[in-house]
């Protein structure tokens, strides 16, 4: 059987497509519509194995590091660190802050007076 204006190669391709379509329709009709079949597990590619391998290599390293540094995060070491930090940096913070504010205020007033014209900001004893 030949169709007018069709090449033999096109006819073979058309027949193949019709055959595939018929197989797909037949396979869909074989399953009852009320039942759900479990989806097959996807084939595991080499990229899907990467997270497992990374976890396998990193987990022992993390566990060893955690064990070695457990003493640092204990209450005695941390308390000692905080006491030393307070003694070194925060003990006299209030007095240092007050002194800094005083000197900043004095510096700011001196700059303001230096920018002020002599006529407006003349000292009061020069009347």
Swiss-Prot record:
It comes from the Eukaryota. Residues 1-27 form the signal peptide. It is found in: Secreted. One of its GO terms (cellular component) is high-density lipoprotein particle. Pfam families: APOC4. Expressed by the liver and secreted in plasma. Glycans are attached at residue 63. Its main location: secreted. Keywords: Glycoprotein, Lipid transport, Secreted, Signal, Transport. One of its GO terms (biological process) is triglyceride homeostasis. Belongs to the apolipoprotein C4 family. May participate in lipoprotein metabolism. This is Apolipoprotein C-IV.
